[in-house]
């Protein structure tokens, strides 16, 4: 079978095994929108989409010494580009165009992801590992996830933002799930949420969140929040039974109204089957090339070499940079220049007293009996007036 055919969604399985004809399950509006679009009909208007995240900065320009602009300026600049919406993603999927997705966890990474033109940016609970040094994703709280979402939203004005619901924020009941999702949307400023798993309670949670007007991305295969039950970070769908369950789980999430499903660490044929069976996009991570799109963790693909995360750096991740080496070299050079007093030199000591005020300042110090301080100030005046010679600052001692 050709690659292009695998990217064209087709129904391969007997879905009555999951949703029999007599089932009372009705696909929510988001799923219907996707079906209408794929069959050439006119889809309803996109579901509720928060735009508050695009103006989460206080809007005040930062002082000129910091370069001005700040988050508001960045957001305004990025907003000039066409914003990615669910309609954008549906269109790409309908045309068979791959969907690009990557994680981000703070304002700088949000800016980078937005500038690179990604379709989707996931503010993942993997922040627990790559940003906070934990061995898994479980410790991060809902409040902390919201803060990460807010930071990314300030920097990413164009890309479609997805916020993870962290472990412990949606398992107890559908009411808890909806409440957590509403908080992530309203306070975090994202466009949608992602939840893991396909157990009946998770399907109910997904359906309830969609019914509340919030777009939901599903996540099956290796679900990191279930690491204790899975016995570690292990690939899923490697037996016939578990492979079929992956496809059935994807179908169940689609019927619950999810607009896309992440397939993590499953064999490529399993991902291909799920992709072909669905009418919504699949996003692969360690699932081969036959998904509708791909996602990787920001720190993994950039090679930042976070020590805590390096222990579990995934085999499927291609490293596109050695940012960790660049950072280490820059930090080492800075430390060396501080210790050798070659930084800051005159070119990085920009703030001066007006020439007419120098003598008055020195005399004022001497009048207060601060002669040593006056001598130090005079030395500094002479130093900052010097030019750098061959890259080495020349200190002229005040006489």
Swiss-Prot record:
Transmembrane segments: none annotated. Keywords: Magnesium, Metal-binding, Mitochondrion, Pantothenate biosynthesis, Transferase, Transit peptide. Its cofactor is Mg(2+). Coiled coil: none annotated. It catalyses: 3-methyl-2-oxobutanoate + (6R)-5,10-methylene-5,6,7,8-tetrahydrofolate + H2O = 2-dehydropantoate + (6S)-5,6,7,8-tetrahydrofolate. Its EC number is 2.1.2.11. It holds the Pfam family Pantoate_transf. One of its GO terms (molecular function) is magnesium ion binding. Belongs to the PanB family. PANTHER family: 3-METHYL-2-OXOBUTANOATE HYDROXYMETHYLTRANSFERASE. Catalyzes the reversible reaction in which hydroxymethyl group from 5,10-methylenetetrahydrofolate is transferred onto alpha-ketoisovalerate to form ketopantoate. This is 3-methyl-2-oxobutanoate hydroxymethyltransferase 2, mitochondrial. It comes from Oryza sativa subsp. japonica.
